[in-house]
């Protein structure tokens, strides 16, 4: 690698020096700006003074970028003149290889880079690891043919992925339509409404502290685990026994309890703790335990319905971190038909949503296969299989 690429990395101006950032006009890239494509925008900008007093360096448009921290192997090609922080490596000089050829070669090497990552809470790689890689360097015309064929195949794949993503969006719309229709019935019938606080046995906010995470221990939920209608524990997080006990002093969460995200990017999503699961609450969430006159799934579906979405929009506070207060949620009105009608409504909703979920699983499988296909295309390309 060192024979064909000279790697460099950027830096971060001192955060406490406002003159390094205020009214800055130099795009300063962080890993979140990398998009596995051409990067034309940055979340942050720095000033000339910030540039001079840090390790950040101006790099030209057309430069290859590779993430070294966290999202290891995330790529980009600069579409603008900019600088980066130290978490991003950039190709200062390429010898005998084109930028696009190296871009796709590094994309093929992503899984290997991830496996070479080291660290505690966040795995990282270094420039030393990048320099240790071997790279195949065919003649320029072969490189051009490879890039052309890869992009041709990726273009076909992108069209299929776009169709799948559109299907997912349509399924999301259908979900909301099912919930809207189910609860509109009660509006038309003028079914009595009650404040949520009046028909729940317990409504408990989460502890207002960041838990100390550990590799193994008791399960502690984050709002990133929340999906409408269920918990996604594919990426679990754990805390120690003592932290767990401390976080359940207000109320021990039980299977069947309704969880609701009330802050941040994942705002307004309700799910239920499934049977056999012992958990404590992380941050930005609350717990609702229904009484005998309220079906917990009826409450969950109502919290996920368009009716509550509109109420949340009216009551939302904060811009950088949107949130809704527990006190406001307690005052939310919910139609309360008799328990038998609630049970029937839940059955109808879940019968219709089960079809939706089946299709969504098929779509997700196809999307995963598309990602695998990209890697297969890259692997074959650099082994001479697609040209």
What are these regions (language model features)?
Residues 1-36, 52-54, 192-231, 244-248:
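Low-complexity, Lys/Gly-biased intrinsically disordered segments
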Residues 1-11, 132-147, 155-156, 166-167, ...:
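Non-catalytic DNA-recognition/assembly elements of restriction-modification systems
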Residues 11-16, 33-46, 55, 64-84, ...:
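Short, ligand-facing micro-motifs at secondary-structure edges
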Residues 59, 247, 252-253:
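Short, well-ordered loop/turn sites that connect or cap secondary structure elements
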Residues 68-71, 82-89, 100, 119-141, ...:
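A short glycine-rich beta-alpha junction/loop motif
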Residues 102, 143-146, 299, 303, ...:
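Interdomain signal-transducing alpha-helices
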């Amino acid at each position: 690698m060192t024979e064909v690429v000279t790697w460099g990395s950027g830096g971060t101006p001192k955060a406490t020096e406002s003159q390094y950032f205020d009214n800055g006009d130099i795009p300063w890239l962080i890993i979140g700006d990398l998009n596995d494509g051409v990067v034309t925008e940055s979340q942050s900008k720095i000033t000339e003074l910030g540039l001079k007093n840090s390790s950040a360096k101006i790099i030209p448009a057309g430069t290859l970028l590779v993430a070294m921290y966290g999202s290891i192997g995330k790529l980009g090609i600069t579409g603008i003149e900019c600088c980066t922080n130290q978490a991003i490596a950039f190709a200062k000089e390429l010898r005998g290889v084109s930028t696009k050829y190296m871009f796709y070669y590094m994309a093929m090497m992503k899984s290997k880079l991830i496996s070479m990552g080291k660290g505690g809470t966040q795995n990282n790689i270094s420039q030393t690891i990048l320099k240790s890689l071997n790279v195949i360097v065919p003649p320029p015309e072969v490189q051009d043919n490879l890039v052309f064929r890869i992009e041709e195949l990726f273009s076909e794949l992108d069209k299929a992925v776009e169709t799948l993503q559109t299907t997912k969006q349509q399924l999301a719309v259908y979900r909301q339509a099912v919930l809207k229709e189910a609860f509109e019935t009660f509006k038309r019938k003028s079914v009595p409404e009650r404040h949520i606080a009046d028909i729940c046995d317990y409504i408990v906010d989460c502890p207002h502290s960041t838990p100390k995470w550990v590799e193994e221990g008791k399960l502690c939920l984050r709002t990133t685990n929340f999906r409408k209608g269920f918990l996604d524990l594919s990426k679990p997080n754990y805390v120690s026994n003592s932290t767990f006990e401390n976080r359940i002093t207000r109320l021990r969460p039980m299977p069947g309890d309704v969880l609701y995200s009330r802050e941040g990017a994942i705002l307004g999503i309700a799910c239920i703790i499934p049977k056999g699961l012992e958990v404590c609450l992380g941050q930005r969430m609350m717990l609702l335990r229904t009484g005998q006159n309220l079906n917990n799934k009826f409450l969950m579906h109502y919290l996920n319905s368009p009716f509550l979405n509109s109420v949340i929009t009216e009551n939302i506070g904060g811009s950088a971190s949107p949130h809704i207060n527990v006190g406001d949620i307690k005052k939310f009105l919910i139609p309360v038909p008799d328990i038998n009608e609630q049970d029937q409504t839940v059955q109808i909703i879940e019968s219709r949503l089960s079809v939706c979920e089946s299709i969504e699983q098929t779509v997700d499988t196809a999307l995963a296969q598309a990602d695998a296909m990209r890697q297969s295309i890259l692997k074959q390309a650099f082994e001479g299989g697609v040209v």
